[in-house]
Amino acid sequence: MTKNIHKHRILILDFGSQYTQLVARRVREIGVYCELWAWDVSEEQIREFNPSGIILSGGPESTTEANSPRAPEYVFTAGVPVLGVCYGMQTMAMQLGGQVEGSNEREFGYAQVEITTESALVRDIEDALSPAGKPLLDVWMSHGDKVTAIPADFVTVASTDTCPFAIMANEEKRFYGVQFHPEVTHTRQGQRMLERFVLDICQCEALWTPATIIEDAVERIRQQVGEDHVILGLSGGVDSSVTAMLLHRAIGKRLTCVFVDNGLLRLNEAEQVLEMFGDHFGLNIVHVAAEDRFLSALAGVDEPEAKRKIIGRVFVELFDEEACKQSEVKWLAQGTIYPDVIESAASATGKAHVIKSHHNVGGLPKEMKLGLVEPLKELFKDEVRKIGLELGLPYDMLFRHPFPGPGLGVRVLGEVKKEYCDLLRRADAIFIEELHKADLYNKVSQAFTVFLPVRSVGVMGDGRKYDWVVSLRAVETIDFMTAHWAHLPYDFLGRVSNRIINEVNGISRVVYDISGKPPATIEWE
């Protein structure tokens, strides 16, 4: 029997901060399981979850507004440690009898806080010492309102010149508030503070590791499916690949992977997926060669959202056809990860807006009557990659740049044709190959090539040619919510351009996209 890796757990209540998922990832990195819930949960739900500690996230609202979010009262009577971060500190202070006021001085960015009182939260933690010998911390602030009076049973632990209560604490009740963001890397000792809270104050044991996650997932898969057979749509992407490896470890040949080659993959990608998972790892793979079917369905369609929906629909039809041939199959596996679960919950409550539709086997017909197996649904993407490494998947595959679900269908602008896809595949392969050779691939967050359905005059030898244009795109980003275009060296771009024009017959011009996000999106469609 494996250890219960969920035994010690932290509950994070989300007040809307852009950093809230980062808080959860930091807690997981410490080795402790946590979940992220909306702030307005019931006492019954908290009791049922039985957390070892609670973190109140930051948020964009003002606690001085009458209808602003508040922590459930039970948070402060549950008898477990509580850490309030930014807005979380402000609502803690206000709900426990302190005062919060709006401020004309919005504090955003780097700040240095001076620790004036000892606290379990910052014990033996410092970045420097003040002239008076007091510990100093380099932190990241992002707030307008600030606490102007702390609750009666709290003490001031640290302050800045403009923020008198940068850290407050009630050591007896184990309540702590920080006006900065310990989860961001700009707060240099932030991870150590979170470790103090999670491991020392909440007394959690670090049981959440790649090896124990795999052991737990394998056991749970076996308990869920018993002796039944499972089917999985394998794309070769990170999530479906790790899902396949977990299921293979748990149930072996009772897993059938359906790999649909839609003709919209990268150069040699289909062959690589089949070789790795079929020949090397020994998985049972059904290969569906469906390029003609996808391209026929896409003929004459140039609107991006329509293309996405067609690609998703045809995939579902093909997968359904293959699943119906597998009479023993009782379960459908999906590579759903924790951010998908969070996003779905937000959509269900009307708190999210779909900018681009996602195509997934979640749209499979109800008449298939298959149970659902989602072994990654508790995991963030970085955790999925870590367990992928532990399972023996190659680093280059797990840390490859993101590739859209519809593939080249949204990187060929306008109508998708086989000729365009073939040209784009070869041009993109050259770009990626040169990025690796120049040691630039891992220095950018995402890089790819886009096919533009416009012709441009070129000169080749003594003759002229009238051929297609491609655009190179490379961006740097932390969270893919915002992005800067990558300032790649001119000589590198020149080398890539020359190779594409000389080696890919049919392309006469290469341009480089220098648009940031916003206003542009990272993908062109």
Swiss-Prot record:
GO terms for cellular component: cytosol. The keyword ATP-binding applies. Residues 208-400 form the GMPS ATP-PPase domain. ATP binds at residues 235-241. It catalyses: XMP + L-glutamine + ATP + H2O = GMP + L-glutamate + AMP + diphosphate + 2 H(+). Pfam families: GATase, GMP_synt_C, NAD_synthase. The active site is at 86 (nucleophile), 181, 183. Keywords: ATP-binding, Glutamine amidotransferase, GMP biosynthesis, Ligase, Nucleotide-binding, Purine biosynthesis. It is an enzyme of class 6 (ligase). Coiled coil: none annotated. Residues 9-207 form the Glutamine amidotransferase type-1 domain. Gene3D superfamilies: 3.30.300.10, 3.40.50.880, HUPs (3.40.50.620). One of its GO terms (molecular function) is GMP synthase activity. Pathway: Purine metabolism; GMP biosynthesis; GMP from XMP (L-Gln route): step 1/1. Catalyzes the synthesis of GMP from XMP. PANTHER family: GMP SYNTHASE [GLUTAMINE-HYDROLYZING], GMP SYNTHASE-RELATED. NCBIfam families: guaA_Cterm (TIGR00884), guaA_Nterm (TIGR00888), PRK00074.1 (NF000848). Homodimer. This is GMP synthase [glutamine-hydrolyzing]. It comes from Serratia proteamaculans (strain 568).
